Structure formats: C-alpha cells, structure tokens
Amino acid sequence: MAQKIIRVGNIEIANDKPMVLFGGMNVLESRDMAMQVCEEYVRVTEKLGIPYVFKASFDKANRSSVTSYRGPGLEEGMRIFEDVKQAFGVPIITDVHEPAQAAVVAEVCDIIQLPAFLSRQTDLVVAMAKTGAVINIKKAQFLAPQEMKHILSKCEEAGNDQLILCERGSSFGYNNLVVDMLGFGIMKQFEYPVFFDVTHALQMPGGRADSAGGRRAQVTDLAKAGMSQSLAGLFLEAHPDPDNAKCDGPCALRLDKLEPFLAQLKALDELVKSFPTVETA
C-alpha cells in the first residue's frame, strides 16, 4: 500500500518514514515559557535526530469551566509563534476553532489543526482546507476510525490533500478514554500519515469536576504501544511544572524527562520500521 508523503519545509511525514514529533505545550501561558519549552524540545530532537514541529494552542475554546484559562488569544498568540519561529527556525502547529481564524493562522503556522470535538463541523473543515495549509485532523472521541474518510473527503473536495490523521483515544463510558490499537491500521488504509496524540489519550475528561484529569504516569507505556504500529509520528505535550500547568497538567510529561522518553520512542520506531511487512489478509 503506497503511503502519501506530506512535506513541511524540509520534513517528510509518512507512515513509512522516520517518526516526526509534534511537541510543545498545551496552551501558551507566556512568551517566556513558550521559548523555554521550545528550546528544550529543539535541544533534545536535534540530539536524537527527530524531525520536530512546535505545538501550542493560542485559545482553548473547549475548556470544562467558563472560568478556566483559555490562552492569550489569536493576535498575541500569533505574535508569540512568530517569535518562536524567528528564534528557533522550527515549523509551528496550532489549532483553530472558528472558520474566520483559519486564514489568519495559516499565514503564520505551517500546520493547522482541526480539533477532535469540531472534526465534523463542515464549515470549519472547508475553511481550513481552502487555506491550502497542511491540516492535522484529530479523530473525535465519538468517531470510529473508518469514519475519518468522510472528513478527508470534505478536505479533498475543497481542494486540499495535504492531510494528516491523529488518534487521541475514544470515549469509554463516562470520564474515560481508551485507544483501539487496531484503529491505527484502519486509518493507515487511507494512505495519509497517521499520528498518535498520547497526551490527550491519557485524559480523563471531566475527571476533576471542572477540568480534565489524566494519567501522566502511564505516558511511556501508552506511547510505546501506539508507536509500535509504525506511525508517521507522535504528538506530545510537556511542561516544566505539570502540577501547576494552566491546562491538562495531569497528562503532560515533565519537561526534564523529555530526552530519555524520546530516546526510547525513537529506538522503538526504528526497530518497528526495520521489519518487513507480513501480509496476513
């Protein structure tokens, strides 16, 4: 099965290429923290030889509580992203929540992300597709892997085939998510690159009454399980002080654990992709 290659700058993204990292922090808390986090990601990924794209959100529009921190907003967020790109020369990925944001974000960011909760919103999908930017499509917690073909079709009909799919877990009763490992293979049949968002797969939605809980201690186990499926890359959020992060701290990797964590994932990715394909159908 031929696998599509998506190019972002000099990075090639495909299920049969070396893993790419979409990594950073959940939400922009400050310019200084964005610089601190990106600097460590750049140091580690350059040392390990992992192609890297910086990730953060300028607005978390789907927080559990109306009083929860959402981020600096569109204008300030784009200024911070421009500063990060200038300082480190890395591509940027961020999510958009409204059709009117798509073109503005695509002028600054290299990849625009369709949030899982909004992945069936046709107006948003079409607006994002029409920018011509690479789109990272998060699989909704309530969608089966095979249903992602409909979102891909919407983008393609709007003239965009620069697409990436991203697994982030499926609803399993209340306040819980599970990851169906067979779903990766189903989505890979569409031939687009598939990523694994291990951070949000660790969520316990609404698990802390007014915010999401998480299972940070299991991040390495779950990441290894996902990346054993020969994927295009990993989506990861880290924080210098997860217990005091303004969003999704319970799921975030400690920033000082980034290097040993990624070293194991890179070794696993290389091993898995060294195996010949065994046809069992």
Curated annotation (Swiss-Prot):
- EC numbers listed for it are 2.5.1.55
Query: What is its pathway?
Result: Carbohydrate biosynthesis; 3-deoxy-D-manno-octulosonate biosynthesis; 3-deoxy-D-manno-octulosonate from D-ribulose 5-phosphate: step 2/3; Bacterial outer membrane biogenesis; lipopolysaccharide biosynthesis
Q: List, alphabetically, the SUPFAM superfamilies matched.
A: Aldolase
Q: Which InterPro entries match?
A: Aldolase_TIM (IPR013785), DAHP1/KDSA (IPR006218), KDO8P_synthase (IPR006269)
Q: What does it catalyze?
A: D-arabinose 5-phosphate + phosphoenolpyruvate + H2O = 3-deoxy-alpha-D-manno-2-octulosonate-8-phosphate + phosphate
Q: Which Gene3D superfamilies match?
A: Aldolase class I
UniProt key word Transferase: yes
Enzyme type, top EC level:
transferase
Q: Which UniProt keywords apply?
A: Cytoplasm, Lipopolysaccharide biosynthesis, Transferase
GO MF annotations in UniProt = 3-deoxy-8-phosphooctulonate synthase activity
Q: Which GO terms describe its cellular component?
A: cytoplasm
Signal sequence annotation:
none
Q: List the Pfam families.
A: DAHP_synth_1
* Chief localisation class: cytoplasm
User: Which locations, inside or outside the cell, does it occupy?
Assistant: Cytoplasm
Gene Ontology biological process terms in this record: keto-3-deoxy-D-manno-octulosonic acid biosynthetic process
The entry sums up its family as follows: Belongs to the KdsA family.
- This one is known as 2-dehydro-3-deoxyphosphooctonate aldolase
Q: What species is given as this protein's source?
A: Pseudomonas fluorescens (strain ATCC BAA-477 / NRRL B-23932 / Pf-5)
Q: Which gene encodes it?
A: kdsA
